[in-house]
Amino acid sequence: MSKSKPFTIRLSEEVGSWLERENRRTRLPKSALLEILAEESIRTRRFPGIGFRGPEHARRAWVIGTALDVWELVELYEGKGAERVLSEHNASERQLDLALSYYETYPREIDEALEENAREPEEWHEISPSVIPSPPKSG
């Protein structure tokens, strides 16, 4: 997130208390927490049907009503086409269109997730050897 002008805000006691707890839990500055919340709120208003999930350091856009993140629907669409995605996965045409519209607006975010998921098994094992088993040796 880019630097912006200082902004003063008065918060309700409830919101202030919540920010204090989240600040202690996440160790993120309250201003960063508010910026994250504002960004997600703006995106959910621009794209009704999109929500966010995951830990603070790796929040992901997902399509509400499906089990799929936006990047997963985009990956399925690019690999199978709309007709197969709609017939083989729990997503409506509206939900697929929503994911594609979100991708069109935030391509960098989704492309990064697609790239991350495209890693080879050997690379995943190198990153997390205790979680990802060694790929079988050929030959």
Please annotate each region the language model reported.
Residues I9-L11, L19, T26-E39:
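Short amphipathic alpha-helical segments
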